[in-house]
């Protein structure tokens, strides 16, 4: 290896055999049999190899693309119920990545469009969990955005381009990886137009955000500041093609059921011509959501252009008591399994009796928070036990029954030493 300050043994100046720079113009000059290469050319070669590897990696990933059935079976391991939504998502995601693998155009010249997804369902029904589980299974970058924090460019709040920057951060600013990612935009119903008719006043957090999202969701080349953008303003912006990114939008759409019901009722006549229904025949919110049409979403406040960018629409039903009990026990990362693992770290067994699980489910149903409320109920029930357990000795088992959930008694503590066996409170 030759330093730039030194000359060859013969006293003559040495030059890089590739770029022609002299040893004084570069930091290092590496000698080989009758040839030399400088450090700049070595860096350039490394960059070329890295780019080639990036081009090959997506092809390798796509070769093992799981089928819709395999995707749905994986979702079954983590998400209880919502069978129709899982099937729709599995097909949409499979078609999206199949399109990326084969390019936007088929051999016959048919252009394949992008199918972004809209999830409509009550809070705690599994919208976010479905999107997260999909991204984890497919091993692609995933980011979440809250639509309520977004505003038009130039106003206080998050710019829509920030969504792409978050996605880049998830994959260490690897543009090729980011372009195969999934973006989940939550609370999309909260950016609905404030009035049904377009207003002359500026709606920067409602219709304005929908307009800003149009191009991003459909597919555009977004310019995103590089890592540490403000610290290094001289760096060029990264160009990210969003036409390859799958966008999943989700929202509870509170009140949409009334819009659908009004349309359905109008279709069946009004006044003396109206169809009379008994109380039992009244449809649930979940049943009404399955009848959603684009016109209902327009009336709700989404602009037609934005709805057109989300061609795959699926609805999630409200979780009933049995589904909540299943969620507590059956998934791979079920809450009861998580808390049992925490107690296991203290060498203590945690047991939930059947009546306790049912009581937890009933409590969550009353709170109308869906599966999201289950963890807060368990935290409240187990707080004192988790506080005292690390300081206690000989506790081998903790038993939770219905009376504990209802606040009528404390958890039963079973000690390894039978002389100490007792309940915390009778």
Curated annotation (Swiss-Prot):
GO terms for molecular function: ATP binding; ATP hydrolysis activity; ATP-dependent protein folding chaperone; protein dimerization activity; unfolded protein binding; zinc ion binding. Zn(2+) binds at residues 16, 19, 38, 41. Pfam families: AAA_2 (PF07724), ClpB_D2-small (PF10431), zf-C4_ClpX (PF06689). Keywords: ATP-binding, Chaperone, Metal-binding, Nucleotide-binding, Zinc. SMART domains: AAA (SM00382), ClpB_D2-small (SM01086), zf-C4_ClpX (SM00994). It comes from the Bacteria. The keyword DNA damage does not apply. ATP binds at residues 122-129. GO terms for biological process: cell division; proteolysis involved in protein catabolic process. GO terms for cellular component: HslUV protease complex. InterPro entries: AAA+_ATPase, ATP-dep_Clp_protease_ClpX, ATPase_AAA_core, Clp_ATPase_C, Clp_protease_ATP-bd_su_ClpX, ClpX_bact, P-loop_NTPase, Znf_CppX_C4. Residues 4-57 form the ClpX-type ZB domain. NCBIfam families: clpX, PRK05342.1. ATP-dependent specificity component of the Clp protease. It directs the protease to specific substrates. Can perform chaperone functions in the absence of ClpP. Component of the ClpX-ClpP complex. Forms a hexameric ring that, in the presence of ATP, binds to fourteen ClpP subunits assembled into a disk-like structure with a central cavity, resembling the structure of eukaryotic proteasomes. Belongs to the ClpX chaperone family. This is ATP-dependent Clp protease ATP-binding subunit ClpX. The lineage of its organism: Bacteria, Pseudomonadati, Pseudomonadota, Gammaproteobacteria, Vibrionales.
């Amino acid at each position: 290896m030759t330093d730039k300050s030194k000359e060859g043994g013969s006293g003559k100046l040495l030059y890089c055999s590739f770029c022609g720079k002299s040893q004084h113009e570069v930091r290092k000059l590496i000698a080989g049999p009758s040839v030399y290469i400088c450090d700049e050319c070595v860096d350039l070669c490394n960059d070329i190899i890295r780019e080639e590897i990036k081009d090959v990696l997506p092809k390798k990933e796509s070769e093992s693309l799981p089928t819709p059935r395999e995707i749905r079976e994986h979702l079954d391991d983590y998400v209880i119920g919502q069978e129709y939504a899982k099937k729709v998502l599995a097909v949409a995601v499979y078609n999206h990545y199949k399109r990326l693998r084969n390019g936007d155009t088929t051999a016959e010249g048919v252009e394949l469009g992008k199918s972004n997804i809209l999830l409509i369902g009550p809070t705690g029904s599994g919208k976010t969990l479905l999107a997260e589980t999909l991204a984890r299974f497919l091993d692609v970058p995933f980011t979440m955005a809250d639509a309520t924090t977004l505003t038009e460019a130039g106003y206080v709040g998050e710019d829509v381009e920030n969504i792409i920057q978050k996605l880049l951060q998830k994959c260490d600013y690897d543009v090729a990886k980011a372009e195969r990612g999934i973006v989940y935009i939550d609370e999309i119903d909260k950016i609905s137009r404030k009035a049904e008719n377009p207003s002359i006043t500026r709606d920067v957090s409602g219709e304005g955000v929908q307009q800003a999202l149009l191009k991003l969701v459909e597919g555009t080349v977004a310019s995103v500041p590089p890592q540490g953008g403000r610290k290094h303003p001289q760096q060029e912006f990264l160009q990210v093609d969003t036409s390859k990114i799958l966008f999943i939008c989700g929202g509870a759409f509170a009140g949409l059921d009334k819009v659908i019901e009004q349309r359905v009722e109008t279709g069946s006549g009004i006044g003396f011509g109206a169809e009379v229904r008994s109380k039992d025949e009244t449809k649930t919110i979940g049943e009404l959501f399955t009848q959603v049409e684009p016109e209902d979403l327009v009336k709700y406040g989404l602009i037609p252009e934005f709805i057109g960018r989300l061609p795959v629409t699926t609805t999630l039903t409200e979780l009933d008591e049995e589904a909540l009990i299943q969620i507590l026990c059956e998934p791979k990362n079920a809450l009861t399994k998580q808390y049992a693992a925490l107690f296991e770290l203290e060498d203590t067994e945690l047991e939930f009796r059947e009546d306790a699980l049912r009581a937890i489910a009933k409590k969550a149903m009353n709170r109308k928070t869906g599966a999201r409320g289950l963890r807060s109920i368990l935290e409240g029930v187990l707080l004192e036990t988790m506080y005292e357990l690390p300081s206690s000795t000989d506790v081998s088992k903790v038993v939770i029954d219905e009376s504990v959930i209802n606040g009528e008694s404390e958890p039963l503590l079973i000690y390894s030493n039978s002389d100490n066996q007792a309940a915390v409170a009778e």
